Amino acid sequence: MRFFNAHKSAEDGNYSETTNAISLKNERQSRDLSVNKHGRMLLTALLENFCQLYDNNPAKSKRLFALICHTLQKIGILEEEYIEELAAVRSNYQDALHHLILQAREAIRLDDAEERLLALPDPTNVFEKFPQETALSKFSVDGLNVRQFRFRDLTLESWLQSRNSRYIEDFEEYSLLGRGGFGSVYHVRNKIDGAEYAMKKINSTFQQMSYSKIFREIKCLAKMDHPNVIRYFSSWVESTTEATQMPIVMSKNSSRVLGTSSYCDVNGMDSIIFEPTESSALTDDILFAEDPGTESIISTSRKSSYSSTTESSNFENLESPRNLHDSNVSTFNNTTILDDDYSSSMHISKTGPTHSFIIYIQMQLCFDDLESYLIRRNHFLSFPLCKEQIQLHTDLFRMIINGVMYVHEGVNLIHRDIKPSNIFLAKSLPEDRGSVPLISYNDKNDLKEYITPKIGDFGLVVENKKNTETALSFLERNHLPNLQDETQHIGTATYAAPELLDAMSSQHNKFTKKIDTFSLGMVLFELLHPFQTNMERATKLQDLRRGNLPEEFVEQHICESSLILWMTAKDPTKRPSLLEVLNCGLLLPNQVSMPNISNIVSTNHLDVETQMKLIMDENQRLREQIAVLRSRIQHLETR
């Protein structure tokens, strides 16, 4: 037993050393990335300033600046620091550099004054000048003698971080709702209008994707206007340092909002875009996470949750980044001991700048999402659902379809990350567009209330290029899902279409709107089939990905089963369009369970014979639909 414990202790020690080494390596890589971005942004700011000096015409100076930067980008000196969206950040750098020059001139002036003062001898006490001269010792910088204390006071970051922050001045931060590959999401209150919002922060330090792609989600949100799509309010960019960022307040009662992206996932059901490690690069491609409790397609490391109704244990996984002080500092007799690697990393941290810029996206705050709702519902209901519940959930699904159809047809985009955690539920009124009745199952409340489902988290959205191939860039190809990599967790493979999973083995893939159709088919099945355990859910969702539905589900839902199998066909060309899904007859608005007053009045004026004829016609229409759908099921089973 002693030998076993000693052996285990040795293994733990080796593991700890390996973990520390990896942490230090990631820290250095992150620091190098920050230094490179810092330098490129400063160079770009200088170039813009020079171009403005060479030509007083603003339009011509902009063209000159763009041409020079584009040329430098081709040879690898710059990336996309010159894009219009980063003009405010470049302006901050220009102001900071101007301030630094003023500091340096003042330091030189004071240095010259000290030189003249020290040149005068003091006859009363000759020895007093030695400690003074030692304190004011000089060192050489490119042949110029500069006093250390003067040079040490010169800093670029002090000016950058002293600028007023719109976020700090205008918003009160309540809690961290979630964090992930495309940023962190916070629950905030605007001090001016008093309203509460979801604020997504994207820190450029952790982004290894191009700047233009960082702004893609913002531009997509800005042009969307639909009741079943999350609402966008504003966005802006600020320069920041670690010292100026607000402290993170993590609340276990936080609300689930659009992750975000991603943000992007995170809960006891299924994670979206959250918490990439330092080694995982962030691109606009799909990086898939496993579904907790699912027979994993792709392994992941940590998960997090910010759903207000998800079990509190899920919040324990929202860990802060590894603290190097904890992993590399030892104590012995109350004496702190630093190992060599940690001392080296401390030196690197001192020399590298920590400045970055943050993109703020102000969006609608939703206090619930479909994933959290399904968790609550499954505690109260079991399969099969009653007729009323089926109608409530099909009405809900119809509104979800409307939102995704708007994304496809209204703004010509493909979401690529449709799943329950990215479908948000906002409280609404019966007369609001896109609202449906639903039982919340909050606090044992079984009363119906009106909610509006909203599609959110557009961090993985892409343009729908009809009849064209979407070529994957080198960056995308090298950061698509790695089945052996446990650090990749953007997106969830459970709901992802097969062609997305196949993208890792091909440089060209035809990404169409049918990607979202597949994901919606998975969501429909989950809406109509309550699960009692995560294992049951995992097994049946994976079976559906293979084209199999439970026999008891098919018996209860013949038409719905056909629709689900149609939507989740492996071949995207065999999947229906969302318009075909809406017109198939299964998602007709409910006119029986919650009719409008006008409908009740008009119905009362119909005679009995007319009502019977309407019922018989509807019955015949449904029989014909069942026959068609059965033939489709047989066709799918014989493939």
UniProtKB/Swiss-Prot annotation:
One of its GO terms (molecular function) is eukaryotic translation initiation factor 2alpha kinase activity. Pfam families: HRI2_3H, Pkinase. The active site is at 417 (proton acceptor). One of its GO terms (cellular component) is cytosol. Residues 298-322 are annotated as: Disordered. PROSITE patterns: PROTEIN_KINASE_ATP, PROTEIN_KINASE_DOM, PROTEIN_KINASE_ST. It catalyses: L-seryl-[protein] + ATP = O-phospho-L-seryl-[protein] + ADP + H(+); L-threonyl-[protein] + ATP = O-phospho-L-threonyl-[protein] + ADP + H(+). ATP binds at residues 177-185, 200. SMART domains: S_TKc (SM00220). It comes from the Eukaryota. InterPro entries: CC_SR_Kinase, HRI2_3H, Kinase-like_dom_sf, Prot_kinase_dom, Protein_kinase_ATP_BS, Ser/Thr_kinase_AS. Keywords: ATP-binding, Kinase, Nucleotide-binding, Phosphoprotein, Protein synthesis inhibitor, Serine/threonine-protein kinase, Transferase. Its EC number is 2.7.11.1. The keyword Cytoplasm does not apply. This is Eukaryotic translation initiation factor 2-alpha kinase 2.
